[in-house]
Regions:
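Membrane-cytosol interface segments of multi-pass membrane proteins
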Residues: 1-201, 218-229
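Internal transmembrane alpha-helix with an interfacial aromatic "cap," most often the third helix
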Residues: 207-218
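Alpha-helical transmembrane segments and terminal signal-anchor/GPI-anchor hydrophobic tails
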Residues: 220-251
Length: 251
């Protein structure tokens, strides 16, 4: 990987594809007559965003944790600094948007106002297994903010010896929860929106971040062209099979 002042250049390409997938899923996919295009799961762009977020946040926390330990500074100050940065980066624009929509009486804003300001709209979406009208794209932001509430404490106060186990356990719990939702027939939207059920993607990103720092030999092997192209091919086949069965169901 190429780094430029702690910036990983390759991730920009992944962000670009994730943005394209999400935008296409929201604004263009249903405009096509082709059943193949309409059935393709472009919504997985959100999952890619979660993986990237898990990777970046975990790497930032682990790097800063090492610096604070070396300087013998208190970790609670690192947590404080982390939340201040997150607040300044996200909250001003987010809340400005919410209150502008409230001021112009945007449809459904009053109905969902408190869910929006508390970053819990995904919980409502999970309970009702339905998109909140006009605000269906806010759920992923809620998941991210809930992730930020919990993850720094785990990354900073769990010892390095046990950190990898905690991350793997998080992924396992998330996948188990998704299976439970599936077998209980609680709905695909609820399954996708519940915070714990999104932790498999966030956790995967975190695990890759951990390996990139503490298991570099393994990480370099996984980042080899053969492994990379194999994963891409496998994932493409998976999407093809899912699209095929979705088409069969629609027909």
């Amino acid at each position: 990987m190429q780094y430029t002042k702690n910036h990983i250049i390759q991730l920009d390409g992944l962000r670009f594809f994730a943005i394209l997938m999400v935008m296409f899923a929201h604004f263009a996919q249903w405009q096509f007559d082709s059943i193949v295009i309409r059935s393709f799961p472009f919504v997985y762009g959100v999952t890619l965003f979660f993986v990237l977020s898990g990777f970046l946040i975990t790497r930032i926390l682990i790097e800063n944790k090492a610096k604070y330990e070396e300087a013998e500074r208190k970790k609670k100050n690192l947590v404080k600094a982390f939340y201040i940065r997150r607040f300044l980066r996200i909250f001003p624009v987010y809340y400005l948007t919410i209150f502008v929509l409230l001021a112009i009486s945007f449809p459904n804003i009053r109905e969902y106002f408190w869910w929006l300001v508390t970053y819990t709209i995904n919980i409502l979406q999970t309970v009702e297994n339905a998109h909140p009208e006009n605000f269906q794209h806010f759920w992923s932001l809620a998941v991210e903010e809930q992730f930020y509430l919990i993850w720094p404490w785990l990354m900073l106060f769990v010892s390095r010896k046990h950190l990898e186990k905690v991350i793997i356990a998080t992924i396992f719990i998330a996948l188990s929860s998704k299976l439970l939702f599936f077998f209980m027939n609680w709905g695909w939207l609820a399954n996708s929106s519940f915070t714990i059920n999104c932790m498999h993607a966030l956790g995967l990103g975190a695990l890759v971040a951990y390996w990139s720092m503490y298991r570099k030999v393994l990480f370099e092997k996984l980042a080899s062209p053969v492994i990379t192209y194999s994963v891409i091919t496998f994932y493409a086949l998976y999407l093809f099979v899912q699209t095929y069965f979705d088409i069969k169901i629609l027909n």
